[in-house]
């Protein structure tokens, strides 16, 4: 990974920031400045993205179906395969240590919790969202996991669907990521939309041909993104689909994140 997120607190001096960027250049990393928040830029935006992927498998999509849709969009690796590679247990422990970052939706990251309960934590145990042969990273279907997730969905009152499309998978995962990015911009955690795009194209496998999540949002139109967020918010957990105020404002003005940043820069 070439990305190096450089995190600035209120007490961090400019000389320290300059030294950090110089170090990034020396070790051939791409430095991006972030303010302090849970997950900084990259992991904070990955949280809703992965939330939707996990919810989709509870609704009846297979892990391969979810990951294939994201990889066809251009992501370097589907998010469920990423969890298997990193370890399902890592995310479970992070959420346990930071319960305030959760949701009132009982399905929130339940897929991870179910797999963790079976010690199916990914490649290091040979089973996770997928099954792996010893010494291999090749993904194979894991029917036991899918059956257990279907049982969990039934307990949660989540109906199994057969009509989940590739378009829905991409929209739910990518639009929720963009929405979080808009919140990050408005809070000043990231200085500019381009910084978010660099984080995602340099460190999180977002397709360079699409420019990054915020550039992609500008390209397809913020009104399109907002309409999708509002649509899914009506039939999913509304709390998790609240549109970012900045996204609503710019969509109403037929604006873009890039133009918003340019206007702010001119004001100094």
What are these regions (language model features)?
Residues 1-268:
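N-terminal glycine-rich phosphate-binding loop for ADP-containing cofactors
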């Amino acid at each position: 990974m070439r990305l190096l997120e450089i995190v600035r607190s209120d007490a961090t001096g400019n000389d320290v920031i300059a030294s950090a960027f110089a170090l990034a250049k020396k070790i051939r990393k791409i430095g991006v400045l972030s303010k302090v928040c849970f997950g900084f830029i990259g992991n904070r935006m990955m949280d809703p993205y992965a939330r939707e992927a996990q919810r989709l498998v509870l609704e009846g999509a297979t892990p391969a179906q979810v990951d294939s849709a994201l990889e066809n969009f251009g992501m370097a690796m589907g998010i469920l395969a990423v969890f298997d590679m990193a370890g399902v247990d890592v995310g479970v422990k992070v959420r346990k240590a930071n319960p305030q970052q959760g949701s009132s939706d009982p399905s929130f990251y339940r897929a991870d919790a179910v797999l963790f309960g079976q010690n199916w934590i990914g490649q290091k145990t040979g089973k996770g969202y997928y099954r792996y042969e010893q010494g291999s990273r090749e993904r194979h279907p894991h029917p036991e996991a899918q059956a257990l997730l279907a049982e969990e969905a039934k307990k949660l009152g989540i109906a199994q669907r057969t009509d989940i499309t590739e378009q829905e998978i991409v929209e739910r995962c990518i639009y929720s990521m963009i929405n979080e990015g808009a919140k990050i911009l408005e809070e000043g955690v990231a200085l500019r939309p381009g910084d978010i795009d660099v984080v995602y194209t340099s460190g999180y496998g977002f397709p360079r041909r699409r420019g990054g999540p915020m550039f992609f949002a500008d390209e397809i139109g913020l009104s399109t993104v907002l309409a999708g967020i509002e649509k899914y918010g009506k039939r999913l957990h509304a709390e998790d689909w609240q549109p970012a105020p900045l996204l609503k404002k710019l969509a109403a003005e037929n604006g873009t994140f890039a133009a918003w940043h340019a206007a702010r820069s001119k004001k100094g």
